[in-house]
Amino acid sequence: MGKDTIADIITSIRNADMNKKGTVRIASTNITENIVKILLREGFIENVRKHQEGNKYFLVSTLRHRKTRKRIHRTILKRISRPGLRIYSDYQQIPKILGGIGIVILSTYPRYNDRS
């Protein structure tokens, strides 16, 4: 059974929010780097840097705080499709999140990509 790195990212960010931590340390893989880039671009994360300990790489992410309170800016993170329950959807059925102000991160299977 493999590790679920996407669930690890979401859980780390949620736990940091509950404990009012400012930074999150995530194991660095191609998928985690791509997801963290999206979260950075969309404003969930304020800053990211790559850190090395021995032969392992980590992403150290600084979470965005609100100006008035010391709480994380946005904390509603959910994983819909997971290894035990895959969700497949037509492009017309992708839901709007939080009335259109949230984001959906999705991946496409390379075989179904229109550039192949």
Swiss-Prot record:
It comes from Musa acuminata (Banana). Keywords: Chloroplast, Plastid, Ribonucleoprotein, Ribosomal protein, RNA-binding, rRNA-binding. One of its GO terms (cellular component) is ribonucleoprotein complex. It is found in: Plastid, Chloroplast. Part of the 30S ribosomal subunit. One of its GO terms (molecular function) is structural constituent of ribosome. InterPro entries: Ribosomal_uS8, Ribosomal_uS8_sf. One of the primary rRNA binding proteins, it binds directly to 16S rRNA central domain where it helps coordinate assembly of the platform of the 30S subunit. It holds the Pfam family Ribosomal_S8. Belongs to the universal ribosomal protein uS8 family. This is Small ribosomal subunit protein uS8c. The gene is rps8. GO terms for biological process: translation.
